[in-house]
Structures are given as structure tokens and as C-alpha cells.
A protein has these predicted regions:
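Extended, charge-enriched "interface" segments that sit outside catalytic cores
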Residues: 1-77
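Secondary-structure capping and boundary motifs in well-ordered enzyme cores
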Residues: 35, 54-55, 79-83, 100, ...
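Extended, domain-scale alpha-helical bundle/helix-rich regions
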Residues: 76-108
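Short, solvent-exposed loop/turn segments at the edges of secondary structure
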Residues: 103, 135, 152-154, 178-180, ...
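Buried hydrophobic positions in well-ordered alpha/beta secondary-structure cores of metabolic enzymes
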Residues: 108, 140, 168-170
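Internal maturation/activation junctions in enzymes
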Residues: 116-166
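A short core secondary-structure module
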Residues: 169-199
Length: 199
């Protein structure tokens, strides 16, 4: 690939990431795969309602490795998706399912950086672009019972401005990356035009 693409930005980081998968990641992925899926913790030990999605610690180890390698922040620092997709290629070779949180995080940060309110961007983007374990994950919550990828036709969730935010009313049939810290949600403001431009 290097012969066709020229020098690879972050080549050392990519080699280190692949090496990590060979040394540790494969075994973690295999063990996590056998251990089962995440589970919902509805209450803490004191009976307080928490509704927290729990994953094995090893899962977080795998996930954070890709974030720290730059699957998100490199796309912005290098003004290109190439390194991000190269990291994703390595990740997908070893654990295809793990690439999903990365792609939906990109699908969150890109429209947010382009269309988000300045106050939201100032609050959220720095957290999603961190290069350490405290990085925020993103999610996209679009699909409704009508289904399909035609958001303009099938999104019935409404958005009503309330104070500094919005109240959303509706149901999502599928949401990606339920363990995310922030989500982009498709909704139609009350009185907005039909079609995708009204979302």
C-alpha cells in the first residue's frame, strides 16, 4: 500500500497498533467474544437506578487502543480520513465488530463539526478529539420504525426548543453505540418542512 499512497502519516503508530493486536489484542478479542455481550446494569449496589451498559474491562482496553492510536483525532489533525480508515482496516482484520464504535463516532463528530451550534462544538469536540483514555465516543440515533435510509421520509421524531436545548418526542427503532457519551439524533423541529432538509 505504501508504494501506491506515498509516505503514510503516523506509519509508526499504525505498525505499533498492528503489533499490539498480535501481542495482546487477538487474545482479548477472542476472550471477549466468548464471554458474551454487554449487559444492562439497572441498579447500583445501593439500589439506586443507574441504567448503565456494562462491558468487560478487556473490551474497554481494545476500544481505547484504537481511539488513542488516532482513529478519530487523526482525521482532524491530518485533515484527511485516510489514517482513520487505515486504523480501521487493521482493527477490522482482527475484530470487525470493534470498528463500529469508531465509525459511528466519526459519523457523530463530522456533522457536529460542520453543522453544530458553536456552544455545542466548543463543549463536545475537544472531548471527542482527546488522544487519551478520556476520549468521548459518539453515536448516531436515526432509524425509526418506518425503516430505511431515507431519513427525510421516515423520521417522525419531533424537536421542540426548550430553554437552551430541545425536547425530543418520538421513538427510535435502532440506535448505534449505546455506550456513547454523545449522540447525533435525527428529529424534525415543529413546523419544519418535509424532507431531509427539514431535519
Amino acid at each position: 500500500m505504501k508504494e501506491f499512497q506515498g509516505p503514510i502519516a503516523g506509519e509508526h503508530a499504525l505498525a505499533e497498533y498492528e503489533g499490539w493486536w498480535e501481542r495482546e489484542g487477538k487474545a482479548i478479542s477472542s476472550a471477549h467474544d466468548r464471554a458474551g455481550t454487554p449487559w444492562l446494569q439497572m441498579f447500583d449496589v445501593f439500589g439506586k437506578r443507574v441504567d448503565d451498559v456494562q462491558c468487560a474491562p478487556e473490551y474497554w482496553s481494545m476500544l481505547r487502543k484504537g481511539f488513542k492510536t488516532g482513529v478519530i483525532w487523526r482525521a482532524f489533525k491530518e485533515a484527511s480520513l485516510l489514517s482513520s480508515f487505515r486504523i480501521g482496516y487493521i482493527c477490522s482484520f482482527y475484530d470487525a465488530g470493534l470498528f463500529c464504535p469508531y465509525t459511528v463516532s466519526l459519523s457523530t463528530i463530522l456533522p457536529l463539526s460542520k453543522y453544530g451550534a458553536e456552544t455545542v462544538k466548543a463543549s463536545v469536540l475537544p472531548k471527542m478529539l482527546r488522544e487519551d483514555d478520556s476520549v468521548w465516543q459518539g453515536a448516531t440515533w436515526m432509524t425509526e420504525a418506518g425503516g430505511g435510509s431515507d431519513l427525510g421520509r421516515y423520521v417522525e421524531t419531533t424537536a421542540r426548543p426548550v430553554g437552551d436545548g430541545w425536547t425530543l418526542t418520538g421513538d427510535k427503532y435502532f440506535t448505534s453505540n449505546a455506550i456513547a457519551d454523545v449522540a447525533v439524533v435525527a428529529a424534525r423541529p415543529e413546523g419544519a418542512a418535509a424532507g431531509v432538509r427539514g431535519l
